[in-house]
A protein has these predicted regions:
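His/Asp/Glu-enriched, well-ordered alpha-helical/loop segment
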Residues: 68-69, 75-82, 86-88, 220, ...
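Divalent metal-coordination and catalytic microenvironments
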Residues: 7, 22, 27, 49, ...
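Metal-associated gating/positioning segment near the N- to mid-region
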Residues: 50-117, 128
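Active-site core of metal-dependent hydrolases
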Residues: 74, 91, 188-285, 301, ...
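Metal-coordinating catalytic core of metallo-dependent amide/deamination hydrolases
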Residues: 129-236, 240, 274, 306-307
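C-terminal cap of metal-dependent C-N hydrolases
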Residues: 5-11, 340, 352-387
Length: 387
């Protein structure tokens, strides 16, 4: 048993305590509060003067599949660009547990990240949520957390337009995605019909089979879209096929905030500390997270997107706060909102009894560039402690 005592405890979903205890047993949070008795045999961690938060979550990264340094071709496994539809491939099969990014990101207070395929394809395959611990992909992965990657805009256009093959345009992206989802829906319907009449079973198709849970609404889609028109196209297609979706990046979301609010959109906003390398991100602004978070029906998460850059996401969030994002919405963006997007809110994202003992301790406000993460705990095991 472990007890983190005397810290300012930010539960996220409940009360913030100026001085409280987090009690941990068997990898789970047992109790949180100011008057928690500490057993005599507990390992005591004194967090006096520090802020205690849930382990942080970046729910859109390429950690472990675009491993670093990215200049080495042998470490780049995030885009299978041999064809625009790659629903059957899995980021899990490219998770590299010795990726350079793991240690700096973990030491910045992050305990869970979502590792997604890149956006070079219209359908890029499934991503996976991973804990930043373990020695194999299977140890790191959270079973059942797969979600399907779709991409709109410049990346698929550039990758396939240069080859003079579809999709060369935004029309082509929407068209090939609709066509594939149409085929997947028919395939899914045939599978259902075959449950009572085996003669109606479709010819096995590995790619379409991977999309069956998507068109049945059983697997969430992560829809890469920067420009406002691409965001609207993504939502239109999601509604046409009854998909459960999240908008990734949502760079021009501020332009259509009322529409996004009406649709109760979940979005993952970022990155911001990169060069404006594409026309579709030239309207990027650090006001965007604050603008979107003020809308009551929009769920906002915050991302650094890449690999080790996630280690400076807390500092970046400090810039968002300066531009209008509240602290409450900021901490939710890398804890409980991110957990909800990953559909893991029953396990991570807040300090509550019964949840995984993923904890970060900072020597000040986590989003102050002068603060340091002093302790990181994942499933009750300490991976960093400089208290």
């Amino acid at each position: 048993m472990k007890a983190i005592i005397n810290g300012k405890v930010i539960t996220v979903t409940g009360q913030t305590y100026d001085k409280a205890t987090v009690l941990i047993e068997n990898g789970k949070i047992k109790a949180v509060g100011p008057d928690i008795p500490v057993p005599q045999d507990a390992e005591v961690i004194d967090a006096t003067g520090c802020w205690v938060t849930p382990g942080l979550i970046d729910c859109h990264t390429h950690i472990c599949n675009f491993s670093e340094p990215g200049t080495m071709p042998g470490l780049s496994d995030g885009n299978e660009m041999s064809g625009p539809i790659q629903a059957q491939i899995r980021a899990l099969d490219a998770v590299y547990p010795d990726d350079y990014a793991i240690v700096p990101v973990r030491e910045a207070g992050f305990t869970t990240v979502y590792s997604t395929p890149g956006s070079g394809n219209v359908i890029g395959g499934t991503g996976i949520s991973i804990k930043l611990r373990g020695h194999t992909a299977r140890e790191m992965a959270i079973a059942g957390s797969e979600q399907m990657k779709f991409a709109f805009g410049e990346n698929p256009k550039r990758n396939y337009g240069n080859r003079k093959q579809m999709p060369m345009t935004r029309m082509g992206i929407a068209g090939i995605l609709r066509e594939t989802l149409f085929e997947a829906k028919n395939y899914s319907d045939a599978l259902k019909a075959a449950e009572t009449d085996p003669s109606k079973a479709p010819k096995p198709d590995f790619k379409l089979n991977a999309l069956v849970p998507v068109v049945r609404g059983e697997m969430r889609c992560r829809m890469h879209a920067h420009r406002s028109d691409d965001i609207l196209t993504a939502i239109s297609i999601a509604e046409e096929f009854g998909l459960d979706y999240v908008i990734e990046h949502c760079t021009e979301g501020f332009k259509i905030k009322d529409f996004l609010n009406e649709k109760h959109v979940k979005c993952v906003v970022g990155p911001h500390l990169t060069s404006p390398s594409k026309l579709e991100i030239h309207n990027r602004t650090m006001d965007n997270p604050g603008i979107l978070s003020k809308e009551p029906n929009i769920t906002v998460c915050l991302t650094a997107d890449t690999g080790s850059q996630t280690s400076v996401l807390p500092m970046t969030i400090g810039f968002f706060i300066r531009r209008g994002l509240s602290f409450e919405d900021a901490i939710k963006g890398v804890t409980i909102n991110a957990a909800k997007v990953l559909q893991l809110e029953d396990r991570i994202g807040s300090l509550e009894p019964g949840k995984d003992a993923d904890v970060a301790v900072f020597d000040g406000n986590p989003f102050d560039s002068m603060s340091l993460c002093r302790l990181v705990m994942i499933d009750g095991e300490v991976y960093k402690n400089t208290l």
